[in-house]
């Protein structure tokens, strides 16, 4: 099927994914085949579309949902900015939820940038309120989780202070029914490595604490993928799925250089095998920012 502006993701059928049967990356109609493999009991993973991947198409929220549904995805990961604009413009969250469910999709996670982690008390209070509003909105869509990145943090935030703040976020999420996932951004001075994110999650001391991982950010932050094998199903519930090329080098690579899984040099097969070794089957969410796509 040719790629067109109306069908922007058809070029690769949206996602190359891993099949347990072959223990490697497969090309072709990956999302459709993945569902078929799951029915046969050979692929335990579910596949999600992070809406950053098609942001360049400038679709409406409903258009994004339709693209994900028609492509054969299991789930979506929308961005709060666009959801809030949809709501402010008179869009019905009830109707949007129905549209999502009619496509057989779930909202496994969402991307927000509330400043919950910052040291400034007033900014952090505003950030917590923003996070609460975001989670309230997501709950109306039946969403399960929300990203909790180190948004707004300037310089290093004490990890123990971050853990206390993350716990507060988790407590609010528990009341609403949406789980905040601690997210690391590779190279970020506050949460720039997998180990830092996991430290914060552990020290938060909350039963819902979990980790939102990312292939690119793990590499960018200088963490080794072997470290993921120390985690388990509780920590690894949702994972941003992408790859990175050999060039640009690590010190120059950016978000826009991410490529489809299997098109770069990341140890994709080993990462998936590592998940399975520890009994984790996180939802794999395709998150790209590559303008070439």
Language model: regions and residue ranges:
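Boundary/entry segment of secreted carbohydrate-active catalytic domains
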Residues: 40-59
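Conserved, mostly hydrophobic/aromatic
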Residues: 49, 68, 76, 100, ...
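N-terminal secretory signal peptides
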Residues: 1-9
């Amino acid at each position: 099927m040719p790629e067109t502006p109306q069908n922007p993701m058809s070029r690769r059928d949206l996602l190359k994914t891993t099949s347990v049967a072959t223990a490697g990356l497969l090309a072709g109609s990956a999302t459709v085949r993945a569902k078929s493999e799951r029915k046969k009991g050979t692929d335990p993973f579910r596949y999600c579309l992070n809406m950053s991947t098609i942001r360049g198409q400038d679709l409406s929220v409903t258009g994004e949902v339709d693209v994900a549904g028609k492509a054969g995805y299991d789930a979506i990961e929308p961005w709060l900015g666009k959801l809030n604009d949809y709501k402010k413009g008179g869009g019905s969250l009830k109707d949007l939820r129905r549209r999502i469910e009619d496509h057989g999709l779930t909202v496994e996670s969402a991307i927000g940038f509330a400043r919950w982690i910052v040291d400034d008390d007033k900014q952090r209070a505003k950030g917590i309120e923003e996070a609460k509003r975001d989670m309230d909105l997501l709950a109306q869509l039946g969403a399960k989780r929300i990203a909790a990145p180190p948004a707004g943090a300037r310089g290093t935030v004490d990890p123990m202070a971050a853990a206390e703040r993350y716990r507060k976020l988790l407590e609010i999420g528990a009341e609403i029914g949406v789980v905040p996932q601690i997210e690391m951004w590779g190279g970020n001075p506050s949460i720039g490595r997998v180990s830092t994110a996991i430290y914060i999650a552990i020290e938060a001391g909350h039963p819902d604490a979990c980790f939102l991982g990312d292939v690119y950010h793990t590499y960018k932050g200088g963490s080794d993928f072997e470290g993921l094998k120390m985690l388990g199903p509780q920590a690894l519930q949702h994972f941003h799925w992408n790859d990175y090329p050999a060039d640009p080098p690590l010190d120059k690579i950016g978000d826009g250089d991410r490529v489809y899984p299997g098109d770069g040099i990341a140890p994709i097969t080993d990462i998936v095998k590592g998940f399975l070794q520890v009994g984790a089957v996180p939802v794999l969410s395709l998150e790209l920012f590559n303008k070439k796509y």
